[in-house]
UniProtKB/Swiss-Prot annotation:
Sulfur carrier protein which probably makes part of a sulfur-relay system. GO terms for cellular component: cytoplasm. Gene3D superfamilies: TusA-like domain. The gene is tusA. It is found in: Cytoplasm. NCBIfam families: PRK00299.1 (NF001423). GO terms for biological process: tRNA wobble position uridine thiolation. This is Sulfur carrier protein TusA. It holds the Pfam family TusA. Keywords: Cytoplasm. Its main location: cytoplasm.
Length: 83
């Protein structure tokens, strides 16, 4: 997991303190702004993101590279699909 954390990202979305559906709505906008293959780090505190973000990635064909939980904070690394 540390190799993912050390990997440079193309963008970061801090959705700390936001509740469903806001983190996924913001994710949708941020992922659009990335280049194809770009890596986005998402930081969230809403436990529903554990369900919603993986489903978002599957539905829109993005890659959920890694996810991690640290003391109530949920971290996700998402690679935008190649167009």
């Amino acid at each position: 997991m540390s190799q993912i954390i050390d990997t440079p990202v193309d963008g970061t979305l801090d959705a700390t303190g936001l509740n469903c559906p806001e983190p996924v709505m913001m994710l949708h906008q941020h992922i659009r702004d990335l280049p194809p293959g770009g890596l986005l780090k998402v930081i969230a505190t809403d436990p529903s993101t554990r369900r919603d973000i993986p489903k978002f990635c599957v539905f829109l064909d993005h890659e959920l590279v890694a996810q991690q939980e640290e003391a109530g904070t949920y971290l996700y690394w998402i690679r935008k699909k190649l167009d």
